[in-house]
């Protein structure tokens, strides 16, 4: 991909992420919810990410890390990917820690994918031609704020912006193949091909 075009897409992705962070922050503040000190860390959840643009953004951040830090994260990513494979084979759910997490902090916090930014708070989606979908929020949210009245957190415009950017990026790259990768897989895959 042309470096200027890539930079433009990644800059637009950061703008979408800024909007996500602001919307999440506003919803969290309405509840008085702070996402920290959690026993049920979402960093132990096996999220699958589906966008090429987020893969490119995560890899861009990863590639800017010092070589020794990259090697450390790759090693943890391989262990997590292996554990996920074992879990799939056995039906277990061991919940290994995200390979980017170090001492409770994300090593690529500014580049973390959408679901890492928006997880935890009750939300709604309004898909076209279908009834609204409501998401309940995480267990920790319900322990702390479960009796609080619902505050609208509509993810629809945020997903729409990410989908628009994804479509433009895929068109520019001529990529059609769907992506379904964990963070560990994204960090172990140097190039997502056709």
Describe the residue ranges of each PLM region:
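Short loop/turn segments that flank or connect secondary-structure elements
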Residues: 1-41, 45-194
